[in-house]
Amino acid sequence: MANGYFTPGIEGFLTGEIDANTAVLRAAFVRGYTFSAAHKFVSEVTGAGGVINGVSAGLAVTVTGGTIDAADTTATTTASAVDHGILLYQSSAVGGGADVAASAQRVIAYYDTGTGLPIQPGSGATPITWDNGTNKIIKVG
């Protein structure tokens, strides 16, 4: 298990293909996935054995001081299962709007190690609590 950023996700921020200020970012519970920094799309995560079991609403994102943060949220899980990580991804086109197909949804980061991780959700609304310290969701530098 390992937390990590997806290399194409970081490249997406640098090239403007991912925009935390205008696009819709979501968090999803994923189980059965072994992190690969090379993955670019949600469809690659699920194609590598990751099973999505709950997706948050669009995150209320803030970008300041070299960090990306968001309000804590919930994701409704559809079945009880164990050992879920959190997948952060851009669900819309770069300009925002409706969700695009999983084959076009850009993955950004994956978290399965840390306080409260991996998550052991039951059925129903399961909280996602972001770091309130200096690291937030993503910290540059």
Region annotations inferred by a language model:
Residues 1-84, 91-141:
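Small cysteine-rich, disulfide-bonded extracellular modules of the LU/uPAR three-finger superfamily
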